[in-house]
Amino acid sequence: MTFWSILRQRCWGLVLVVAGVCVITFIISHLIPGDPARLLAGDRASDAIVENIRQQLGLDQPLYVQFYRYVSDLFHGDLGTSIRTGRPVLEELRIFFPATLELAFGALLLALLIGIPLGILSAVWRNRWLDHLVRIMAITGISTPAFWLGLGVIVLFYGHLQILPGGGRLDDWLDPPTHVTGFYLLDALLEGNGEVFFNALQHLILPALTLAFVHLGIVARQIRSAMLEQLSEDYIRTARASGLPGWYIVLCYALPNALIPSITVLGLALGDLLYGAVLTETVFAWPGMGAWVVTSIQALDFPAVMGFAVVVSFAYVLVNLVVDLLYLWIDPRIGRGGGE
């Protein structure tokens, strides 16, 4: 298979996944008990007012008509209008998405900076105390609820030690940096505001660490497995026989080859972090898409919920597409193997 045929195949898969998410999200959102028009009008509103709001929102029409209108607007780049705020969903996502993306990138960076060295050491010291510790860490990370871990680190680092802030993106007395990218760290650097940069960095540490903990152990175990496979290859034995230092063999020979199969796991981790940010943002009062969609669900804001699902699923599939193409570029044998 050629590069373009694989790209075409993956793009079709992207379209099918996003279409499936649209259908499933639409069905589930309309199965949730409750009346958005009643919530918007208030408990004391008359039935006539509620019915008028329902007509304005198009909720009085059959479901297939509502779905057709939604898909038609989606093809024109319109995710609808939020029932709760009255603003376009796309406009609200542009406000909240950068905060979620900054948190996800921060968590991924922490997972890589800690997980890769742990995986290397775990492979080099196989079946020793560090190897067992990494295994326990991976199991604990997968089984620990994010909200429980988040509350725990807030109590420890903010409540008892008082060395890190417990929520938000900035202290209340600081003004956000001028909006350029929506990433406070990057915008503060572009503005040359060191005070805002370090304050935003302090606020990012706890939620990013909480979100990264689940994937930290997974990254470490993946690197360990790939490193063990590489360390048993003949070229490693040849390098050792030639008298090269052990650390040089591990870092310059085994590690680059071990990172190739790990690219897929790292790409999937970024997609998972976008979904996993929902609970983490709620716990840390992080003003991103997670906290926004939780409020939208409570208000039965169907357009906002469906817009969130479409954007996040599209980002998830797009990340996988980039990972597949990157993997193909690094190792062209995959494309040749797919065509045989």
Swiss-Prot record:
Transmembrane segments: 12-32, 105-125, 136-156, 200-220, 247-269, 280-300, 302-322
A GO molecular-function descriptor: dipeptide transmembrane transporter activity
Gene Ontology cellular-component annotations: ATP-binding cassette (ABC) transporter complex, substrate-binding subunit-containing; membrane; plasma membrane
A Pfam entry, by short name: BPD_transp_1_N
Induction remarks: Induced by RpoS in stationary phase.
Function according to Swiss-Prot or TrEMBL: Part of the ABC transporter complex DdpABCDF, which is probably involved in D,D-dipeptide transport. Probably responsible for the translocation of the substrate across the membrane.
Subunit structure: The complex is composed of two ATP-binding proteins (DdpD and DdpF), two transmembrane proteins (DdpB and DdpC) and a solute-binding protein (DdpA).
Protein's name in the database: Probable D,D-dipeptide transport system permease protein DdpB
Organism, as annotated: Escherichia coli (strain K12)
